[in-house]
Amino acid sequence: MAQQVQLSATVAESQLGQRLDQALAELFPDYSRSRIKEWILDSRVTVNGKKINKPKEKVLGGELVAIDAQIEEDARWAPQEIPLDIVYEDNDILVINKPRGLVVHPGAGNPDGTVLNALLHYYPEIMDVPRAGIVHRLDKDTTGLMVVAKTVPAQTRLVEALQAREITREYEAVAIGNMTAGGRVDEPISRHSTKRTHMAVHPMGKPATTHYRIMEHFRAHTRLRLRLETGRTHQIRVHMSHINHPLVGDQLYGGRPRPPKGASDSFIAILRGFDRQALHATMLRLYHPIRGIQMEWHAALPEDMVELINALKADTEEFKDQMDW
């Protein structure tokens, strides 16, 4: 069912000379400027009783503006009963701990069976929120924390916070090779020119920055803590591959098994059996979109990564007398 939106306000004198869409976005901060622009173009906005369909129209201050519009639900998406691990929930947001193998949003090759379909089952009212409240994504086989908006105002403010880089997202990962120090990868990312399922570092891509630090050294692998400044598709995976340290198990970006010399059969079996990128969204910190208080959540590593790290530790311990560090 569509959500009816009826709003009115008086343009402030201080807004003299602003574009109409800019002025309305300031007057009605619960709605994004792009949504307001769509309403203007669709003749859903009046100024002093007259319909205006030009977002660039300048305001003088003192005008009475009104919006009479609808937010349409998207009937393409069907509710599905899929288990969700809810870490936190209130009237405005919820935080989930996503398992491996679960796609976040329907798309090519995954028309259903996603986080979005599950959200519609447990929270039917979220149909009225753009993208069913999803404001950022994790790859299908990346595990960990995601925030979801339950209302339009919460969604608008979370999107703005992401764009302003006010939401902190930290990950744990296991990379191939011995890394000597932490650092930063500041390389633009775009879709690969020939492999449409891949992303790649490209000078004409969108800016992307990943910070990383070393948590633990193993014989031929490194455990990392990473922080995103931006949120490009496959960003951590692409950046780590770019610096020649792809993530264990990442078949798209060169993470094939590379057992160190002399490794035991059991260790090799664990390494070869790890069939997803070793990446987990372990910490999420943000200001609540409605209440304004800072909130932080943590998610422990999933069992498969714990098993992998324990195997790496055991292998390193076995060969510690032969290592130079």
UniProtKB/Swiss-Prot annotation:
Reactions catalysed according to its record: uridine(1911/1915/1917) in 23S rRNA = pseudouridine(1911/1915/1917) in 23S rRNA
Active site: 139
Family: Belongs to the pseudouridine synthase RluA family.
EC number per UniProt: 5.4.99.23
GO molecular function: 23S rRNA pseudouridine(1911/1915/1917) synthase activity; pseudouridine synthase activity; RNA binding
Cellular compartment(s): Cytoplasm
Disulfide bonds: none
GO cellular component annotations of the record: cytoplasm
InterPro entries xref list: PsdUridine_synth_cat_dom_sf, PsdUridine_synth_RluA-like_CS, PsdUridine_synth_RluC/D, PsdUridine_synth_RsuA/RluA, RluA_PseudoU_synthase, S4_RNA-bd, S4_RNA-bd_sf
GO-annotated biological processes: enzyme-directed rRNA pseudouridine synthesis
Domain annotation S4 RNA-binding: ranges: 18-91
Swiss-Prot/TrEMBL keywords: Cytoplasm, Isomerase, RNA-binding, rRNA processing
Main location: cytoplasm
Protein name listed in UniProt: Ribosomal large subunit pseudouridine synthase D
Function: Responsible for synthesis of pseudouridine from uracil at positions 1911, 1915 and 1917 in 23S ribosomal RNA.
Pfam families named in the record: PseudoU_synth_2, S4
